[in-house]
């Protein structure tokens, strides 16, 4: 090995008599023009009249990094140059001689046997820490009179772009055109060192030193055709036709694939390219064998996806059986599939009794953030305290007048419930929610159905089929029960904002008069409550839910007569008469989930304890000031 180094050093030190260059010793290294024209080199100090450079100038810039020095300059072989790159020094490098070594082990490249080699696998790039270097000498035996085609030159540097931090790559630019080179000697090639490790910095044409990013280390290294994998090389060898390779304009573009002319793919002599560091630089490789998210396993048969460096324009059969191929047929289940499976398993499992169906819940992508759970009596409306006279005593009103107004409203509530909402039929068959018996409904058209003659009330009275314990009758009777609740739901949705149309003209006037008198007696209690309800209703991420101890049908009549239908959809009304408010809160949490915030608004102890058990904030309503404070908090978006 040492003998080979000496022979190359002696060969490089021979003079070149046909050279004439300008003085450029004091400029920074990375001016590649002298490399592009190796036959126009400076002569040695012993060649008379061959150069304007003096012997003293050459010797003043020479430095030895391995303990050996020449008379005029230091000749570094590849190993010495590697050591100098790793050693920070203020000295300058005078010359770099690229040396060819005999084939050995796994560090050499196998040539194709052609006499002319069109690519140069190395790259002559200096470190950013070196001072200006002197001119170079090359042996005329090593370099014929024709220029070497693939040494980086000024035209090539103009198309380069600093790679560090760059996200877009111009991979379709044409390489610079060079004069054809016919080499007669042995082709020059660096040993297969990792150029990204050897070269710490790249100096561009403008003179700015670009620090090499980690993505550059182990970048693509192209050589005339490897027969065996190289050291540090993954077993993925991409065999591609020459037409499918588009040269990039990055830092390795000109010394890797540029030819003497703008050649087509058929003129390329070296179709085999190997890639280093595949596990770290995924952006260089086509992901064709890795199927898209949850697709079938025939993805490799289609057109592979392109990468930032090169494009594979046709499928590569050799990649379909790589060790890292992803088998999508045995892929793990996705979150969407798991959600669907859980939904199928849990559907109906939480239903209480035979006829109850799960309440409609918001879709998975719902933006619901807050649920306001309201009590009805003495919170939104003043009703029970009017009947007992407690409201009149507390606020100094006329007790007989208050009781009279309460009785008139109670009569109107039950009249509406009996006349239009089948309360006579459903009083003994009360439900917690309007959809609890919808599973028994067969969807029959009710436009011509006669509820008075279907025999539902007689069967229920004689056989006592509907008991508070939840015992139910036969299938036919349950279907008739479901018909009635469906009809109630239709009437509610039709007249929730126009209860006067349901009452008729005569009763409508009486209802409006009664409402005005109650508002006057209660100092606009309902009006203040409606302000807060309307604010919540206008929010897209909030919802109102009503939980009352009144039976479901009378509760619906109250909501209609107090003009609350616009604030409470019928699906959001629950009756706690049979199961209590705590159980109603549990059903509401099961419906809307535990990620939303629940705010309970009421006046009684029962809803306060239920809210405390489920860690829900509780807003107590005991006077007008509490309603006004709630409205202000909602206006300021504290709630």
From Swiss-Prot:
Which cellular compartments is it found in?
A: Cytoplasm; Nucleus
Q: Which residues are Mg(2+)-binding? A: 375, 377, 603
Source domain of life is Eukaryota
Phosphoserine modification sites? 361
> In which tissues does this protein get expressed?
Highly expressed in heart and skeletal muscle.
- Comment on bound cofactor: Binds 1 Mg(2+) ion per subunit.
The top EC class, named as a word, is hydrolase
What GO terms fall under cellular component here? cytoplasm; nucleus
Catalysed reactions, as listed in the record? O-phospho-L-tyrosyl-[protein] + H2O = L-tyrosyl-[protein] + phosphate
Q: Where is this region: Disordered?
A: 1-72, 210-232, 300-368
| Crosslink feature (Glycyl lysine isopeptide (Lys-Gly) (interchain with G-Cter in SUMO2)) location | 14, 52
| Family designation | Belongs to the HAD-like hydrolase superfamily. EYA family.
- Record's subunit section: Interacts with SIX3; translocates EYA4 from the cytoplasm to the nucleus and promotes activation of their target genes.
Q: What is the name attached to this protein's record?
A: Protein phosphatase EYA4
* Gene that encodes the chain: EYA4
